[in-house]
């Protein structure tokens, strides 16, 4: 057992660097706990506000005996041109702050270097979010391997890799609306340029940031991926080959949350009472509820959110609708009240204004569908719970995830969104799916057609495979063992 080796021979010490955004931090905290369960000493480096988000979950883990510690560093906000006190991606109020935020999180090299000089035992490996490219310099200085974590699936990572190697495909496109086929892919898949991460032209400072990220990717020792072999075997195999064997699929990492409190508080404390939420779900028929959540950084204009709400109402199906970033959606709150929407749907619609206990909700027997923005965390949680997906991608890797879910795995239905909704440009795009389109998509997903039944059957089977993957002897469990053995050999050869 690797856990025995780490205790008896050379104590492994992994230092984890999560990017300061909710969707990036959540799986990284899960990874910390998974590795600590194998006897690896874990140090998480983050800022005070981000540490506070996960205080309850990590405190329970530490109290249970897991060797996890958190080191807090001050983000140089003002030096990078940010307002004082901004430490999280979600707290950015405008597009203009994105570049300063990226610069700020990558100005931590000097304080982190000092931390490494004082750490004991000496770190044997870095696991870093791909956005924090400065960690490559730390790894090089201290002669330790750096493992990248992208937070994406193998399908998306392979797509990005193939297009980097065949850049003429993107260069020859006449417009951002022109479709192209990804070459050398196990399945025929078409995209437009904006639908692929880092494929569009980036002006000014953004291009420099991208180049730093790509260079850090090239110099990394390997990659861990929050997916499982059985979900996307062809893509996992091809991506591992592209990374010269140094790619380990270790997910779904969310399944390390076995205690009810950990599930309820994964990512943040829920803004609804857990018992109230479960009581509402208990009152609904099995498989009847549509869970609706467009992510922690929902960039959807008010006009579109109104159409979504009216479509949910006209579907006549029970639903839970999570509206996050609530302080940014005051106009929607007013519409809920003034239009009578909240009153009309009160008997079959539960509105959660803020953070929801998503894992608990998806695991409930009354939930039969998940309308999602296709962020990889949410996509994987839905599949792991055996829930078919209604896809509504917005940005970055989410269109890749939609293609995987709808075209390759055939466990989802597209709501019809094909245009990227860039932050700050929501109102320009306006309504992409009207209320009739929403109603039609909900019926297609939740109905009793042969296709709907087949989707439910397929996603249930994939959910069962997810649970087997993380059990002892499963593919993801074995890959964690393989990763630790690899790093152990490196650590011993360096000492």
From Swiss-Prot:
At the top of the EC hierarchy, this enzyme's class is transferase
**Keyword Chloroplast in annotation:** no
Q: Which InterPro entries match?
A: UDP_glucos_trans (IPR002213), UDP_glycos_trans_CS (IPR035595)
Which residues, by range, are in coiled-coil regions? none
Q: Which domain of life is it from?
A: Eukaryota
Tell me the residue numbers annotated for binding UDP-alpha-D-glucose.
Answer: 23-26, 355-358, 373-381, 397-398
Which GO MF terms does the UniProt record name? UDP-glucosyltransferase activity
Q: What is its EC number?
A: 2.4.1.-
An individual GO BP term: saponin metabolic process
What is the recorded name of this protein?
UDP-glycosyltransferase 73C9
Q: What job does the chain carry out?
A: Possesses very weak glucosyltransferase activity toward 2,4,5-trichlorophenol (TCP), when assayed with high concentrations of TCP.
Q: Which cysteines are joined by disulfide bonds?
A: none
Q: Gene3D superfamilies this protein is in?
A: Glycogen Phosphorylase B
């Amino acid at each position: 057992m690797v856990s025995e080796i780490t205790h008896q021979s050379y104590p492994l010490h992994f230092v984890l660097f999560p990017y300061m955004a909710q969707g990036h931090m959540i799986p990284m905290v899960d990874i910390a706990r998974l590795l600590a369960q194998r006897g690896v000493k874990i140090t998480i480096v983050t800022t005070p506000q981000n540490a506070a988000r996960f205080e309850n979950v990590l405190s329970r883990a530490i109290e249970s005996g897991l060797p996890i510690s958190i080191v807090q560093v001050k983000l140089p906000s003002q030096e990078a041109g940010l307002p004082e006190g901004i430490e999280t991606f979600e707290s950015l109020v405008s597009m203009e702050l994105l570049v300063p935020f990226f610069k700020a999180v990558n100005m931590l090299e000097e304080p982190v270097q000092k931390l490494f000089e004082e750490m004991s035992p000496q770190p044997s490996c870095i696991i870093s979010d791909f956005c924090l490219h400065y960690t490559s310099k730390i790894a090089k200085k201290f002669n330790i391997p750096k493992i990248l974590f992208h937070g994406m699936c193998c399908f998306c990572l392979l797509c990005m890799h193939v297009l980097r190697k065949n850049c003429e495909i993107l260069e020859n496109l006449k417009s951002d609306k022109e479709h192209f086929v990804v070459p050398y892919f196990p399945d025929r898949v078409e995209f437009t340029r904006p639908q692929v991460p880092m494929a569009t032209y980036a002006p000014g400072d953004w291009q420099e940031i991208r180049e730093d990220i790509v260079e850090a990717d090239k110099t990394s020792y390997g990659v861990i991926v929050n997916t499982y072999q059985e979900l996307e075997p062809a893509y996992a195999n091809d991506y591992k080959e592209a990374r010269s064997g140094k790619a380990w699929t270790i997910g779904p990492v969310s399944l390390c949350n076995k205690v009810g409190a950990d599930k309820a508080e994964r990512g943040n404390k829920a803004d609804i009472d857990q018992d109230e939420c479960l009581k509402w779900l208990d009152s609904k028929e099995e498989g009847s509820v549509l869970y609706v959540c467009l992510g922690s950084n929902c960039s959807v204009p008010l006009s579109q959110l109104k159409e979504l709400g009216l479509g949910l109402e006209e579907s006549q199906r029970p639903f839970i609708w999570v509206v996050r970033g609530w302080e940014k959606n005051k106009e929607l709150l007013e519409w809920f009240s003034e239009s009578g929407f909240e009153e009309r749907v009160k008997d079959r619609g539960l509105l959660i204004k803020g953070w929801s206990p998503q894992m608990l909700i998806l695991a409930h027997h009354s939930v039969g569908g998940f309308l999602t923005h296709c962020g990889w965390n949410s996509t994987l949680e839905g599949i792991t719970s055996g829930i078919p997906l209604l896809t509504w991608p917005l940005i970055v890797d989410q269109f890749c995830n939609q293609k995987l879910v709808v075209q390759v795995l055939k466990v989802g239905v597209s709501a019809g969104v094909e245009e990227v909704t860039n932050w700050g440009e929501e109102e320009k795009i306006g309504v992409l799916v009207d209320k009739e389109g929403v109603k039609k998509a909900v019926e297609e997903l939740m109905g009793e057609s042969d296709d709907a039944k087949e989707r439910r059957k397929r996603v249930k089977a994939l959910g069962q495979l997810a649970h087997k993957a993380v059990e002892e002897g499963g593919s993801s469990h074995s890959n964690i063992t393989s990763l630790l053995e690899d790093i152990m050999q490196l650590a011993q050869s360096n000492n």
